[in-house]
């Protein structure tokens, strides 16, 4: 039994095509494998935790007597997005996919937004959040139109200048869009208000961003932990992904390295339960942008922080490192890839080591539930008794 579990999701760090990759157009994808081959990876601490034993990675040693336990996990849900991956890690099987809109949103949805808001919509395509205000910000100021855009994730974002559209009005419009896109035919995971300020050529997004997410489609192990008096400390995007459900404390982060800093602060305080950290830069800055070298450096930077994380662990802490999907930066397009994800498990009190049987994302939730003696979901098999 562990008093605390520290679960770190390396967002999009997949480890080879999943058995159903063909359904997603992702045959041949391999985030870690292709990064190792094309850019090289110097990751001695992840090696020592057994990463190289899960699948062959060019230049990464398969350390037979590694610390802790290693395996790979398969996703059973129908999506390959962030919310689906995290929700499955916490015990849900998502049977309806969230939708992405690589060609923009349908005209009928835009018309509903225009009719409700009394404002026109511009852009309506995937765009970087900073580039979209550079390109459309001045037009928005002159016309009062709504800048509606998306990304490779199932999100609809609305940008508006705070001096042109008051925050309350922007929030009201986003709430309306949230209400009409929860179900088929849209199934959009998040609506995001993206206010900005400044003058043409010098626009900046403000901290008044607001996310309109969805509650998970069922009871997760986070809910079980919270209901039974355990701490559930969310670091990074986790609170947004679960819409606050099952979370007892939420900490925002600015980057991967800030995320590690925040996690270390959490680890150095007294609590019983789960710390749940998402490190998003792998996905947001390097995966979608197909930046192989940047992705490799980000993995190496995380590897360099692992000794600090392990030093901060108490004797009865368990560290779990995994991912939520793939995002192979060598693959065509800009979207996530359907892949296995790694699982590394380490505790200072382990007296043995080795590989765990290959499993499923929700095995993590089943293991955490068994450890804290709280109800699990119907999905997943606990590997707790194999961590010796």
Curated annotation (Swiss-Prot):
Binding site for Mn(2+) 1: 11, 324-325
This protein's record includes keyword Transmembrane: no
Required cofactor(s): Mn(2+)
Principal location class: cytoplasm
Catalytic activity, reaction form: 2-deoxy-alpha-D-ribose 1-phosphate = 2-deoxy-D-ribose 5-phosphate; alpha-D-ribose 1-phosphate = D-ribose 5-phosphate
GO annotation, biological process: 2-deoxyribose 1-phosphate catabolic process; 5-phosphoribose 1-diphosphate biosynthetic process; metabolic compound salvage; nucleotide metabolic process
Cellular localization per UniProt: Cytoplasm
Leader sequence residues: none
UniProt pathway annotation: Carbohydrate degradation; 2-deoxy-D-ribose 1-phosphate degradation; D-glyceraldehyde 3-phosphate and acetaldehyde from 2-deoxy-alpha-D-ribose 1-phosphate: step 1/2
The keyword Aminoacyl-tRNA synthetase appears for this protein: no
Binding locations of Mn(2+) 2: 283, 288, 336
Molecular-function GO term, any one: magnesium ion binding
InterPro entries documented for this protein: Alkaline_phosphatase_core_sf (IPR017850), DeoB (IPR010045), Metalloenzyme (IPR006124), Phosphopentomutase_DeoB_cap_sf (IPR024052)
Keywords: Cytoplasm, Isomerase, Manganese, Metal-binding
EC identifiers of the protein: 5.4.2.7
Gene Ontology CC: cytosol
Enzyme class: isomerase
Record text on cofactor binding: Binds 2 manganese ions.
A Pfam entry, by short name: Metalloenzyme
Family affiliation: Belongs to the phosphopentomutase family.
Function: Isomerase that catalyzes the conversion of deoxy-ribose 1-phosphate (dRib-1-P) and ribose 1-phosphate (Rib-1-P) to deoxy-ribose 5-phosphate (dRib-5-P) and ribose 5-phosphate (Rib-5-P), respectively.
NCBIfam families attached to this UniProt entry: deoB, PRK05362.1
Designated name of the protein: Phosphopentomutase
Record organism: Enterococcus faecalis (strain ATCC 700802 / V583)
